[in-house]
Amino acid sequence: MSEKLWGGRFSTDITDDVLRYTETASVDSRMLEHDLWQNIAHVLMLGRAGINTEPDTKALLAGLLDMESSRADGGLQLDVRQEDVHLNTEFMLIERIGPVGGRMHTARSRNDQVQTDARMVTREWLLDASEELLMFVQDLLGCPESEREAVLPGYTHSQAAQPISVAFWKAAHAQALLRDASRLMDAWKRININPLGACALAGTTFALDRDYTSRLLGFDAPMVNALDATSTRDWTVEVAGAAASGAVNLSRMQEEIVTWSSNEYALAEVHDSFATGSSIMPQKKNPVVAELARGKSGRAVGALVQLLVMEKSVGLGYSCDLQEDKPVYWGALDTYLDTIRLCRRQNLHTAFDGARGRALCWDNFSTATEIANILVSRFDVPFRTAHRITGDLVNAALGGGHTLRNVAFTTTFLREEHDIDISEVDMKQICDPLHTLRSYISAGSTGPTRVSEQQEQGLADVTDRLAEIRQARTRLWEAKAECLRAARSVVGGVSVPELAMEVGV
């Protein structure tokens, strides 16, 4: 007969190569804490419901608390021979307290167990990732006031378009990161529901109290349908999708850093601690964190695709196809969180050269739109006509080797070719990128006052969201504390009926 905990049906054990192919213990270690927490809550519920006797409940809880203490001290390691984290914890419990340890698995399956553990891990990751994103937003919006007038060229179609400020650019990326954090926390209400008690797929003939375990585990409520609870992985797709979108947003940001830190642009300088050199070219300084943030976004996108493909052909009811979610899912979440943290730190130590940006904008015609606007506002020229006149000016300047710095040329051309008289003093101001930037007044624009408004609004939003995250985190801490306190009470001699009155449920 097989020696596995499930081996009664089998005449022999699986071979070593089958074990290597099928085990998940090697990637389950992150769920160990949560599996023990879940076990304690489940045993408390079984005792409270009268499914297990009080002596058995006390013995089970004593063993589990001992295991939790060992885990906290780093002394609990998973054995791949036990296949997964769930069989590992049960096997270790039986080793500690004997056959009574087998009563822990009453009215439970690994199918609802793994879903419960994975949701518990994911909800904590949602809080961590959202918090990191929001602190990144704080850094971006809390940049020095001088960066509201530090000029950068703004681009469309990878061509110089209009002057913007460093602070405006940071505020734009901050908005994207705020949406990323919103997507993550919006998933909370679909993640933080309790599959425990669904068993294999159809529920159980035991009278379980799923509301009680939901409370002890910090879930909002039990999942409604047992078959759905054990079968679905759409929530991993949702989180992976949010991670993929967020990773792509960070990739776009870092693409600009890579470009602007090149010698040709010389708009940004990445700190040495976020760059590496070349093994052959002594002069090189490579922005490797920014480059890898671009490259590693592919992991998150790839994970999303793999999860979708994994789930598409699996009908309701658990199949081992679904265990393939964990390596790629955890990997994507880890990579995305690491990328957030490193990009945030790099941002704090990246210097921008506003003088260089202003010089580039003088020479790349990016203030031409402002000339057209002046023709509309001061000379009552229809915008389409003003657009054509300014385009004619740019074409003539390019043909003659001029830039908008040559105000003598621009004023002469407008006067002689289009009968528009603007003084050289006024034209110099109109074409000055910093003056143009200061002139923007529309809501949401790059004008310093408007950027200040964006920063103020965004920082207030961040403060509110961080408070919500702290509340959610506190609720999880309190739920675990209540669960452990109840377990210690039973081990210490409190009867299960007394415990029920003590917790007020």
Swiss-Prot record:
It is an enzyme of class 4 (lyase). Keywords: Amino-acid biosynthesis, Arginine biosynthesis, Cytoplasm, Lyase. GO terms for biological process: arginine biosynthetic process via ornithine; L-arginine biosynthetic process. It comes from the Bacteria. InterPro entries: Arg_succ_lyase_C, Argininosuccinate_lyase, Fumarase/histidase_N, Fumarate_lyase_CS, Fumarate_lyase_fam, Fumarate_lyase_N, L-Aspartase-like. The keyword Glycoprotein does not apply. It catalyses: 2-(N(omega)-L-arginino)succinate = fumarate + L-arginine. GO terms for molecular function: argininosuccinate lyase activity. GO terms for cellular component: cytosol. It holds the Pfam family Lyase_1. The keyword Nucleus does not apply. Pathway: Amino-acid biosynthesis; L-arginine biosynthesis; L-arginine from L-ornithine and carbamoyl phosphate: step 3/3. It is found in: Cytoplasm. Its EC number is 4.3.2.1. Belongs to the lyase 1 family. Argininosuccinate lyase subfamily. This is Argininosuccinate lyase. It comes from Rhodococcoides fascians.
